[in-house]
């Protein structure tokens, strides 16, 4: 059941900050409503809601720890309730963005550290998508966030990079299995971006920022507005035939 006046709706994880925040706002400018998650920073989530309203769209913030799979059933119920409030029972787009960083050598990485990265960056993506599949419209779109580190080898990033590589493979499996429903699935792999991710490592460290710029063909580190429009574009009808792809958005990093 769908009201003909209902806008297209995206679910975006981690939308209170960084790349997902930028994605929510780019979607808002295109007339797409968002249900986005935040883990703990409700004030920042409320700011995103207000900015989306200024852009003439709707954004609704729901709390979710994507590393806690036991919360996914209750979250799916809240999504159903929110969709009903919006006059529909389906959403159109899913952006699996939320994640955590990890920096440690293979020798020193603990089992606890590895489990945490796996829980949030892979297991959470797998099972949250599974829980939401009954609610996504046939012909919808899914974008998973990968990373340049699934291609570029940076010592100290093995668990993070390997699990983003797993996201690349999962994306192709999802695209194959969801093909009969005409749901496209792609991965967007950002390069080094100036956000608060990983403690603002690229944004706030001038030496690292310069190092990234020097190894990037376009001569600078990325910013959120280099990524959000790409994700929003990939969800549009213009890219309806793009499927099962890993699309690196890095300005030509390490080529």
Language model regions located:
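Conserved glycine-rich cofactor-binding loop
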Residues: 16-17
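Conserved glycine-rich Rossmann-like NAD(P)H-binding loop of the short-chain dehydrogenase/reductase
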Residues: 32-46
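Substrate-binding pocket helix/loop in short-chain dehydrogenase/reductase
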Residues: 91, 105-106, 110-118, 212
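Active-site helix of classical SDR
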Residues: 129, 163, 171
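Residue(s) in the substrate-gating loop at a strand-loop-helix junction
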Residues: 147
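Short, small/polar-rich loop/turn modules that mediate ligand/substrate recognition or access, typified
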Residues: 179, 184, 242-244
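C-terminal helical subdomain
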Residues: 187, 210-242, 249-251
């Amino acid at each position: 059941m769908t009201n003909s006046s209902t806008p297209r709706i995206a679910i975006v994880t981690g939308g209170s900050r960084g790349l997902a925040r930028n994605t929510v706002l780019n979607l808002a400018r295109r007339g797409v409503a968002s249900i986005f998650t935040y883990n703990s920073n409700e004030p920042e989530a409320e700011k995103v809601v207000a900015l989306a309203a200024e852009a003439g769209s709707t954004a609704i913030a729901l709390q979710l720890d994507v590393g806690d799979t036991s919360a996914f059933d209750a979250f799916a119920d809240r999504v159903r309730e929110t969709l009903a409030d919006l006059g529909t029972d389906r959403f159109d787009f899913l952006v699996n963005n939320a994640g955590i960083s990890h920096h440690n050598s293979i020798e020193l990485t603990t089992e606890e550290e590895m489990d945490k990265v796996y829980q949030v960056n892979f297991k959470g993506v797998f099972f949250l998508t599974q829980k939401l599949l009954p609610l996504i419209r046939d012909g919808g779109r899914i974008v998973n966030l990968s990373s340049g580190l699934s291609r570029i080898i940076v010592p100290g990033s093995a668990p993070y990079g390997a699990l983003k590589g797993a996201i690349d493979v999962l994306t192709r499996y999802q695209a194959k299995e969801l093909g009969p429903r005409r749901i496209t699935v792609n991965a967007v792999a950002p390069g080094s971006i100036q956000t608060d991710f990983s403690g603002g490592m690229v944004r706030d460290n001038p030496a690292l920022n310069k190092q990234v710029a020097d190894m990037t063909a376009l001569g600078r580190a990325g910013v959120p507005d280099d990524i959000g429009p790409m994700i929003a574009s990939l969800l549009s009808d213009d890219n309806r035939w793009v499927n099962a792809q890993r699309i690196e958005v890095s300005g030509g990093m390490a080529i």
